[in-house]
């Protein structure tokens, strides 16, 4: 392996000056210092020439006139727009200003109205259907953007979507919910009694057993132990608490399906029918009178009654209980029901005989003519006799019917006067009785009977004077047949769907 000798620059310069070293003849020229100096000078000279040529070209270009600078294309505007090279993508920026000067501000995307003063290019997001710009002072609505924010809809559109999908908060719709509640109550009432007879004047209910209990019956049975036997009168101070607990007020159904809320005379007394108590079913509105008591309240004893009649009773037709559908077994509920009716009318039966057991075949029914809108005509029982010979009501053959009771009922049936007393505590002057031919008794109904009882005194606790007896609500019975829409109870005058 041969040894490599490395020479430094100083060694090479020393050897070049040595007489022992001879210059080869074919040595390249560029190695010599003179050649290198000459090459350097040549490059400098070429650079100067190139610079001079560049200056000449620029001077010639500045004197050149372009086609854009003709007088027809000159734009009068800010200095930025007055140069021919002030364009973007081959389109003049001043084009929009020309359109504005001509009044064409509705030129679609190219107009400043829709681009918010920004320049329009192919890469711009203004005017594109898929635009998702972060903000814009002008709202360009399109279907795609609305679909992206469908969950953020406000107002009626959002509410209707939630109601259709049963999502979101519950929005109250009183009309629809009330109609649905009416249909439910009508269906439950139809199931509770298959033999219910509904007339415009009188509502009579039979105690037919039901396989499915309604919602109101379930609610009335749920709190029997807590509020059993509490009547409405005890809430307004008409009777003591002990009397209210011992008294069971029968359920009263008014025409039109509207139960009395506060035991008003105008809603409770007119055309009232008392149904026989049943051990299987109870009235839908029993909770308003029995304090949410179920059918068990019919088993209580005979209530305590005051001696004075109540002035809140008028034109009451007392009918015997209809025949229940539980068979031909004898029952002793009739006398007890009669005692309850007397208790509601403010009378106390003079006799204290026990309840007789009456066969079901001996109990007559109430025949009602629905076509008569003013007053329901009731058939006379076969046992009715003139005032000289007082006979007991049908079904109460063993009950001693006193003369006071007969006089009291005759005074209710033969009166044709109407007087409206003021509420307790509002006035001490008794209103005058006003005669109205519209509300007189129908022909052939108890006509010719004289009132055998004198006007009773006011019951304890009433501060006003006793008006002319009997009391009447002051409006014709035809008003009962009108539909009442102000109460939250279903209208049972029409058959359920």
From Swiss-Prot:
> What is the protein's major site of localization?
cytoplasm
Q: Name one GO cellular component term.
A: nucleus
Point to the regions of Low complexity compositional bias. 120-131, 213-227, 400-409, 448-472
A GO molecular function annotation here is: eukaryotic initiation factor 4E binding
Positions of modified residues (Phosphothreonine): 132, 258
UniProt keywords (A-Z) are: Cytoplasm, Nucleus, Phosphoprotein
- Cellular localization per UniProt: Cytoplasm; Nucleus
Q: Where is the composition biased (Basic and acidic residues)?
A: 44-74
Give residues where Phosphoserine occurs: 123, 125, 131, 310, 436
Compositional bias (Polar residues) spans? Answer: 367-385
Annotated segments matching region Disordered: 44-95, 120-151, 195-227, 367-497
Give GO terms for biological process. Answer: mRNA catabolic process; negative regulation of cytoplasmic translation
Question: What is the protein name for this chain?
Answer: Uncharacterized protein C14G10.04
